[in-house]
From Swiss-Prot:
This is Complement C1q tumor necrosis factor-related protein 6. Pfam families: C1q, Collagen. It is found in: Secreted. Residues 97-138 form the Collagen-like domain. Residues 99-135 are annotated as: Disordered.
Length: 278
């Protein structure tokens, strides 16, 4: 509570100033004034026996005396004595309450933009061994192979000649026809073929491996005073039913292949490498 200013009655211009505070009013007055202020009751005007030349003045106001002329004019006006007006001044800071409880949490904000990709982390430890998978479908094992030999020598004639073979080394599923001297592809795929012959002294060796009616590769040796072994091999992409066989060239070029009844000098072999649907 700050000091109060008391104003003199107009009838008495004594030139004196009266100041009073909560210490003069006492604790009871201070509590009463505080109660009246909080209840918004109009201010009370008090009357003193003598008038005070100035109005209510706080202790912190200027200490200069009032103008005597102003005091004299106030006393000669003939107005009745007025009660001094007391206006309490309360420092609001002393009425500050306790700190309130925190309010409820607000709604989550919007998701921010995606940040840049971080650097790769260290390699993790090896995981546990996985369970064994379910068994797969059984493979369809398909093997086709043949190997045949000839012990009879052959000379060129008026026309092309197909080499026939008398001896069978391998003929799986009968894929090589001994009567015609031809291999018939049982399914589409890649096949490998090889041919070995013995040349004849002073004669050419002129033989073709045929794919159907087309010459695939040639086995050739020039005339020589010595006879030697010659070989040729090839891989062919065959469709189902394609035929592969060996053909000797005709007489317009004198040629022959050598063999005898004791040894097998001429052989023709082939087998499936990979079926198309594998």
């Amino acid at each position: 509570m700050q000091w109060l200013r008391v104003r003199e009655s107009p009838g008495e211009a004594t030139g004196h100033r009266v100041t009073m505070g909560t210490a003069a009013l006492g604790p009871v007055w201070a509590a009463l004034l505080l109660f009246l202020l909080m209840c918004e009751i109009p201010m009370v005007e008090l009357t003193f026996d003598r008038a005070v030349a100035s109005g209510c003045q706080r202790c912190c106001d200027s200490e200069d005396p009032l103008d005597p002329a102003h005091v004299s004019s106030a006393s000669s006006s003939g107005r009745p004595h007025a009660l001094p007006e007391i206006r309490p001044y309360i420092n609001i800071t002393i009425l500050k309450g306790d700190k309130g409880d925190p309010g409820p949490m607000g709604l989550p904000g919007y998701m921010g933009r995606e940040g840049p990709q971080g650097e790769p982390g260290p390699q993790g430890s090896k995981g546990d061994k996985g369970e064994m998978g379910s068994p797969g479908a059984p493979c369809q094992k398909r093997f086709f192979a043949f190997s045949v030999g000839r012990k009879t020598a052959l000379h060129s004639g008026e026309d092309f000649q197909t080499l026939l073979f008398e001896r069978v080394f391998v003929n799986l599923d009968g894929c090589f026809d001994m009567a015609t001297g031809q291999f018939a592809a049982p399914l589409r795929g890649i096949y490998f073929f090889s041919l070995n012959v013995h040349s004849w002294n002073y004669k050419e060796t002129y033989v073709h491996i045929m794919h159907n009616q087309k010459e695939a590769v040639i086995l050739y040796a020039q005339p020589s005073e010595r006879s030697i072994m010659q070989s040729q091999s090839v891989m062919l992409d065959l469709a189902y039913g394609d035929r592969v066989w060996v053909r000797l060239f005709k007489r317009q070029r004198e040629n022959a292949i050598y063999s005898n009844d004791f040894d097998t000098y001429i052989t023709f072999s082939g087998h499936l490498i990979k079926a198309e649907d594998d």
